[in-house]
UniProtKB/Swiss-Prot annotation:
This is PAN2-PAN3 deadenylation complex catalytic subunit PAN2. It comes from Drosophila melanogaster. The keyword Ribonucleoprotein does not apply. Forms a heterotrimer with an asymmetric homodimer of the regulatory subunit PAN3 to form the poly(A)-nuclease (PAN) deadenylation complex. Interacts with Gyf. Keywords: Cytoplasm, Exonuclease, Hydrolase, Metal-binding, mRNA processing, Nuclease, Nucleus. It is found in: Cytoplasm, P-body; Nucleus. One of its GO terms (molecular function) is nucleic acid binding. Residues 655-666 have a biased composition (Basic and acidic residues). One of its GO terms (biological process) is mRNA processing.
Length: 1241
């Protein structure tokens, strides 16, 4: 037997407090070891045996803070420090239910009821049924730091904690019935008997309270310092806690025993462990279980104190602290929860299969799923009828049974006989025969399209709304979704020029939420907006306006062969909470997305977001003096005849709280966005009973088309102007609260337009069948006359005698596989009728103004779709007498949804103005003023103006329309040209010696306001000083490291090769730049670790040197900064004209999402490359030419950048000595010998 000291007093051990255990042959080391392996450490035969421990749910992250046996069923409940609750069935610890009760709070206590389980956290009380469904969650201002709870009756519960309130809670009404003040010490332990409620605080005091009134009856002082736990059984109250010893706080080895009859302290009980928790065994009234924080358990008998036997056990807590324990009502099992996340259970020796309760009810489990017969997937003879349907409980047939009228036999439609065959047919009895006119091909059956759809023959197949045999719709190639094919070199082998023959740069659609590419192109080609966003700059980290400016700068400089990515914009977009609330952020698992509603909501969101961001960045400037409120789409939707539920509760009172006034002051100011897209309106609410009138001004950024709901005549025609007018201004009756009447009263609400915008943004709606049916009817009315004319022209043509075999290209007769002879095809013409003319319901131009009565008047061109050019239509303005603020609007851009039967995508058709062509191509003044293009991600093609207003509503549906004020073109042209001139002056030439003064220098700002952070890891970093700012032509060596956000997705082809479906999504983690010349050559001046809020799948530590936690602002010791600020530094270096030296810089700049001209890049991977041979790694180049070994364990971007600079200097030396060719040859020969691996020695 060894006697070792088990106390926590490090200064000295009391001689009369010893711990005894049988150590066997192991020598005593003088202190308790938590990793002790023995279970029974007592002197007698064990009364309990240890069962197999289990790792609780979330145990790898959180400890088990509470365990409780169910009083009604054979279940053990567990709550952890992460707010998660799990139940286990019987001693086999089979998981039964698992659910989250709070996102972050610790589960402090668990109690079971007949109807479920109660889980108490720091600030809430959750009630859930045992199957995991929540019943209620109660929160109160009085619940600040709850610790324990106790059920006094089936419908009464008391809760307390480290606060001065004790809460009496009614489980039936879910209300607090009484609040008792318990003092500053709070109440951490609650117990009860038949007379009192015992409440123990952390100062060592136990208060005896009345069970009904909760008033204080008696007070007992247990320990001198802190009360740890106590238990009540019969007339005894036994406690454990902390006492002062030698001016230190130590665990008291004596259990204080109080007789509740006399309220006096009797003889204490000495234990051999450090008691932390204790509890009476329910079935044995005199036996007590005492538990230490190390997992030691001692069973103490309060009656037979003179008995020499010691019953002690050691629970395997994996070297961690024991946090909770509980005893079953049958005393056959005990459960312990520790900090390592494990649950240990011990069972009585007499009952190795313990029962938690003597009389437990059965636990409800899920119904067993019936097993279906196993059938081979290749068995084509298996009858499906052998799988029996469930028995019908009611009725005689299933709801899925088809009605009898749909079960008739329908045969294939017979092929119609050519009238020419019938006219030449001769009869011989019942049989007729005729010579073959050869006007039709073999094995063809005509398919007659049902009437009611908008479909007409078209020369280039644009109007073909039919479907192929496999169900895929036949649509033009330029509208189809183009899949980007990846190889082992990424997108370097992909020919983008095949899909883009223009001078414009496209956008890749490989990242999530790339559905907005169509809208991004429209915003870019809106000249006034592009100019404002290129000038915008603010200090907000995730500013969408700044990111749009960066993206527009890339689109200005990129070409068709180098499409851009909106990765940085989408990264900031995912962080905006409003975008997530509107459902605009999609994941890879998103399916069946309504793209029409999605892109319209995105249009409304981005306009309002830019408005708020530009206002925040310029709030110190002059503000708009009027009281203007930027309205949302819900306000514009109020112009519809169908008012939402919110309209019933509109109030005509303008009294608002101070918080609303502060919020309105933010959106009332006029910004550059509201000047471009804003339509000023006034909303007049007039109470019908008291004639009280309230007027509210607002600005509408996006207009929703409001279609009629109830039409008396189905053939009634509504033109576009009528629909637009009723959408902008309306009058209706609603139920609203009147302040004068003090009740809801009928109210007339009218909306009027007071000012027109420069750019009119229109959401077309069409997200339901009702609106689509209405628009189809209007489109059919427009095409009726054209269809009649086409039929007349076709009837006058005579069929060719040679039919399909005719080889003459100038034949004037009709052929079954050719157009009519009067048709003249044009390369990009989109014709909806044989004579090359189309009429559309959507006009290319219209005139809108405000008359003397303040009403909006919209006049559309009667020949808007008559085939005239857009320039001719704009010059022929209709008479607009009597109109104020009269403006001519021309269609600027359209967003369409394209559905080919297998997938849907969004495309945009944009009228690119002449100033942009001049900027890109430097065209002469004699060139056309504008040209229409279709933008389908990186596929861009020119189209005719008619195609922008041509829709089938089958596979091509309009989503958003943008109309521009025609008279603003001159202003836009001058603004754009001046912007181009400024941008050209901003980029210095190679001969310039100084940096431009009109560029914002972030390096100077860093000198004035140095970045805060831990610079211990950046001892070699020396920021740029004011006298060493980079100039045009200066060398800067750069390297970047990346982490993976989404892994790569591959598939195995039938030939066994692996194909990349989706590339991995990389994010920049570290950017390092070093000086390339001067006295400080090779010294880094920029070494930024990029903070990220997104989940990182793989840190790629072996290749990047980035470790978990380096990018987290809460734990990182690195020089963390936001991506936007590092991006601004790189952008400044690019604009100044520095030359970057690096290894694989093209991929680095692609992930960083910045465009760098090729003449500003020196890439060592290409310098030391022999044509038609492999690329050489930086590590091998450094070893071969410089004799240094790098990247031995992990990569370091500063080391890599410095190495590339040295390699470039060595390259210049070899070129000067004319030894480079031989050196390159030796490099590849040596690499092949060593298999391109650096030797270890």
């Amino acid at each position: 037997m060894d006697y070792v000291y088990c106390g926590t007093d490090p200064i000295g051990a009391s001689e009369d407090i010893l711990s005894v255990y049988d150590a066997g042959s192991a020598p005593g080391n003088g202190h308790f070891s938590p990793s002790f392996n023995g279970f029974n450490i007592g002197t007698t035969d064990p009364e309990y045996v240890e069962l197999v421990p289990v790792l609780a749910d979330g145990g790898e992250h959180f400890g088990v803070s509470s365990v409780a046996f169910d009083d009604y069923e054979e279940l053990l409940w567990m709550g952890n420090q992460g707010g998660h609750v799990t139940s286990y069935y019987t001693n086999s610890m089979q998981k039964y239910t698992s659910f989250q009760v709070h996102a972050t709070d610790i589960v402090r206590d668990i109690s079971t009821l007949d109807s479920g389980v109660l889980a108490l956290t720091q600030t809430s009380l959750r009630h859930q049924i045992r199957r995991g469904l929540p019943k209620f969650t109660f929160k109160s201002n009085n619940m600040k730091e709850m610790v324990s709870m106790l059920q006094l009756s089936p419908h009464r519960l008391v809760m307390a904690g480290l606060q001065d309130e004790l809460i009496d809670f009614d489980l039936r009404t879910l209300k607090e019935t009484r609040i008792e003040h318990v003092g500053a010490g709070g109440c951490t332990v609650l117990r009860k008997n038949s007379r009192y409620l015992f409440a123990g605080d952390q100062l060592g005091t136990v208060t005896l309270r009345d069970l009904n009134s909760l008033s204080v009856q008696h007070t007992i002082k247990t320990h001198t310092n802190i009360l740890s736990d106590f238990s009540v059984q019969g007339n005894l109250l036994i406690s454990c806690g902390y006492s002062g010893r030698q001016n230190n706080l130590a665990i008291d080895r004596f259990l204080m025993v109080y007789d509740l009859r006399m309220l006096r302290l009797i003889a204490p009980i000495q234990v051999m462990i450090d008691p932390q928790m204790l509890k009476f065994l329910p079935s044995l009234t005199s036996q007590l279980a005492v538990v230490s924080s190390y997992g030691q358990v001692q069973l103490v008998d309060t009656v037979e104190l003179s008995e020499p036997r010691v019953s002690m056990y050691q629970i395997n807590t994996n070297g961690s602290q024991c946090l909770s324990f509980d005893i079953s009502s049958s005393s056959q099992a005990m459960a312990f929860g520790d900090q390592s996340g494990h649950i240990n259970m011990i069972a009585a020796v007499q009952t190795p299969q313990p029962q938690f309760n003597l009389y437990s009810r059965s636990t409800e489990f899920a119904d067993v799923v019936p097993q279906l017969p196993m059938v081979s997937i290749t068995d084509t003879n298996f009858p499906l009828s052998s799988v029996m349907l469930p028995h019908l409980t009611t009725g005689t047939q299933w709801f899925s049974d088809w009605p009898e009228e749909l079960l008739r036999y329908r045969y294939h439609r017979p092929k119609t006989i050519d009238p020419e065959v019938l006219s030449n047919m001769k009869m011989q009895g019942p049989i007729g025969y005729s010579p073959n006119p050869r006007t039709a091909r073999r094995n063809q059956i005509p398919y007659v399209i049902e009437q009611g759809g908008v479909c007409s023959p078209n020369g280039n197949g644009t109007a073909a709304a039919t479907k192929a045999e496999n169900g895929v719709k036949i649509i033009p190639r330029r509208y189809r979704k183009v899949e980007l094919k990846y190889t082992k070199l990424g997108t370097q082998d992909f020919d983008f020029d095949q899909h883009n023959q223009t001078c414009f740069a496209g956008l890749e659609a490989t990242l999530p939420n790339s559905y907005c590419n169509a809208m991004l192109q429209i915003l870019y080609f809106t000249d006034a907006l592009r100019v404002k966003l290129l000038e915008h700059s603010c200090i907000k980290e995730f500013c969408l306006s700044c990111e749009l400016g960066f993206l527009f700068n890339m689109l200005d400089k990129s070409t068709a062969s180098s499409p851009c990515q909106a990765s940085n914009f989408l990264r900031s977009f995912r962080t905006v909470p409003e975008a997530s609330a509107l459902g605009l952020i999609l994941t890879d698992r998103s399916s069946n997305v309504n793209l029409i509603s999605l892109i319209q909501n995105w249009n409304r969101f981005i306009l309002h977001q830019m408005h708020y961001e530009i206002f925040d960045s310029s709030k110190n400037a002059s503000t708009y003096s009027g009281s203007v409120q930027t309205s949302t789409n819900a306000e514009n939707a109020g112009s519809s005849e169908t008012s939402g539920s919110s309209d019933l509760y509109d109030s005509i009172s303008d009294e608002n709280s101070k918080e609303d006034d502060r919020e309105r002051s933010k959106i009332n100011a006029e910004t550059d966005i509201s000047k471009i897209f804003g339509t000023k309106q006034i909303c007049i609410n007039r109470c019908i009973k008291c004639q009280e009138e309230k007027i509210k001004e607002s600005i509408l950024l996006a207009c929703n088309l409001s279609y009629p709901n109830h039409i008396k005549d189905s053939d009634q025609y509504f033109n576009f102007g009528t629909i637009l007018k009723r959408s902008l201004s309306s009058e209706k009756s609603i139920q609203a609260f009147c302040e004068r009447c003090k009740k809801f009263s009928p109210t007339n609400q009218s909306v009027k337009v007071t000012s027109l915008p420069q750019i009119l943004s229109i959401n077309c709606g069409l997200n339901n069948e009702k609106d689509i049916t209405f628009l189809k009817r209007q489109l059919n009315r427009c095409s009726e006359k054209t269809t009649v004319d086409a039929a007349a022209s076709l009837s006058t043509s005579k069929p060719c005698r040679y039919g399909a075999n005719c080889s003459r290209s100038d034949c004037h007769f009709m052929h079954p596989d050719r157009k009519s002879p009067s048709h003249t095809s044009q390369p990009n013409a989109v014709n909806n009728s044989p004579n090359g003319r189309q009429k559309s319901w959507f006009p290319l131009t219209f005139t809108m103004g405000i008359n003397d009565q303040g009403e909006v008047q919209v006049q559309t061109q009667s020949d808007a779709s008559s085939g005239k050019s857009e320039q001719e239509e704009e010059t022929e303005k209709p008479p607009t007498k009597g109109l104020d603020n009269n403006r001519m609007y021309a269609l600027h851009a359209v967003v369409c949804q394209v559905d080919d039967g297998t997938q849907k995508n969004l495309v945009s058709l944009i009228n690119v103005q002449r100033p942009y062509h001049t900027m890109k191509l430097a065209e002469s003044a004699d060139d056309p003023q504008s040209q229409w293009y279709i933008f389908n991600d990186f596929s861009i093609s020119p189209v005719s103006p008619q195609e922008s207003v041509w829709f089938t509503l089958d596979w091509k549906v309009p989503c958003i329309l943008f109309y521009r004020h025609v008279e603003d073109d001159s202003e836009s042209a001058s603004t754009t040209s001046s912007t181009v001139t400024e941008s050209e002056e901003t980029i210095p030439s190679e001969s310039s010696s100084g940096s431009p003064t009109n560029l914002s220098n972030p390096f100077l700002e860093e000198i004035v306001s140095p970045m805060l952070g831990n610079l211990s890891a950046d001892a070699t970093l020396q920021p740029l000083q004011s006298d060493e700012m980079p100039q045009s032509g200066d060398l800067v060596a750069m390297d970047a490291e990346f982490v993976t956000l989404n892994p790569e997705e591959n598939e195995i082809r039938p030939d066994g090769k692996t194909a990349t479906i989706k590339p991995c999504h990389m994010s920049v983690a570290r950017i390092s730049c070093i000086r390339g010349q001067g006295p400080a050559e090779g010294v880094p001046f920029m070494d930024d670790y990029i903070s990220t809020q997104e989940k990182v799948v793989d840190y790629l530590t072996q290749f990047s040197g980035i470790k978990p936690g380096d990018l987290d602002a809460n734990f990182s010791k690195k020089r963390l900064t936001a991506l936007k600020y590092s991006y601004q530094k790189l952008k400044y270096l690019v604009d100044v004209g520095v030359i970057f030296v690096g290894h694989g810089l093209k991929n680095d700049f692609r992930v960083i999402n910045i465009y760098v001209p090729s003449e500003q890049i020196i890439d060592t991977v290409h310098l030391f490359h022999m044509p038609h041979h492999r690329m050489v790694s930086l590590r091998f180049l450094a070893w071969h030419f410089l004799g240094t070994k790098i990247q031995s364990e992990t990569h370091d971007s500063i080391e890599d950048a410095r190495t590339t600079l040295q390699l470039y200097k060595h390259y210049l030396k070899l070129q000067e000595e004319k030894k480079f060719a031989n050196a390159l040859k030796n490099l590849y020969e040596r690499g092949k010998q060593l298999q391109w691996k650096v030797p270890e020695d």
